[in-house]
Amino acid sequence: MQALSQLSYSPTAGANYRTRRALLQTCARLAVCVDIVLGPTLRLHCVFSDIIASRLSLFTTPLPTSASQLRDFPKRLAGRVILITGASGGLGSVLAMGCAAQGATVVLHGRVVRKLEALYDRILAADHPEPTILPLDLAIAKAEDFANVASALQSQHGRVDAIVHTAVLLGSLGPIEHQSFDSWLATLRVDLLAPFGLTRALLPLLRAAPDASMTFTLDTRGQEPKAFWGAYAVAKAGLSALLAILANEWENIATLRVNGVVPGPMRSPLRAQTHPGDDIRRLPSPDVFLPLYLYLISGQPKRESGAVIDGERWLRDAQPMNPPP
């Protein structure tokens, strides 16, 4: 049992998507057998449920362990076109600057033009490739809006090499009976329907790239839903399912990869909203996750797809985070 738990997070275990899926199916069957034979009182199947809930991360190459490993990415992203949703947010802006520093042309998506322009200026001031600004309110976006995004990127860049989903809307927290339909609709639009809509619209551009990747930013509340989290937890659960579906559908497409990261608690406006009494200064900065996202974007994982990386565990195993030289 313990060995299986360790295997589920092993960064060096060799397994492709089919092997991972077979392992999950075996665990699911075994979980049912354990529950039937031993009864619900022991609840041993919870060990397997934890694996089934998209927490399996079996990479054939080691994950980066510190920001100093950014030296291993010298302009690795040069010439690539990378769309980052929610680019003006805490995590999104870190990823935008990091990708631009590695030579990528970053498409900065956000809702507030002023914030996107400020990030645009920072990227240019650092002498990185000129980014593209993409203002779009995902809470009201429709299918034709995503089609227009695809058309504009096709005209301007010809392809999209990577999409990193960080845009998020918390919505309202509280008992279901006190949550409005409109709040749920807006949250589901931003957190679930928009990733689906963008993926669907941009798939031809991803296929035009020689090595395309998609990275979802997930949340433990989607894997372990609890009271009062409402539409946010439902949307994040749906996003985990979308990731698994895409990985399965793209299994035989060598140039397409999709993976996810569950960062865990970090210093962000979202955390300040959900835990207003906490001192978020004591939490990890979004910067510490940059090497992990760059690794997934860069193509270094090759055919690795369908994995979800537990950011908290990765941080515990990582070396001290020192800024790159």
Describe each model-derived feature in a short phrase:
Residues V149, G174-I176, S180-L185:
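Substrate-binding pocket helix/loop in short-chain dehydrogenase/reductase
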Residues T61-P64, L256, G260-V261, S268, ...:
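C-terminal helical subdomain
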Residues R207, D211-N252:
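Catalytic loop of short-chain dehydrogenase/reductase
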Residues T166-S172:
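Conserved NAD(P)H cofactor-binding loop of Rossmann-fold oxidoreductase domains
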Residues A126-K142:
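Rossmann-fold cofactor-recognition segment
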Residues S88-G89:
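Conserved glycine-rich cofactor-binding loop
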Residues A104-A118:
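Conserved glycine-rich Rossmann-like NAD(P)H-binding loop of the short-chain dehydrogenase/reductase
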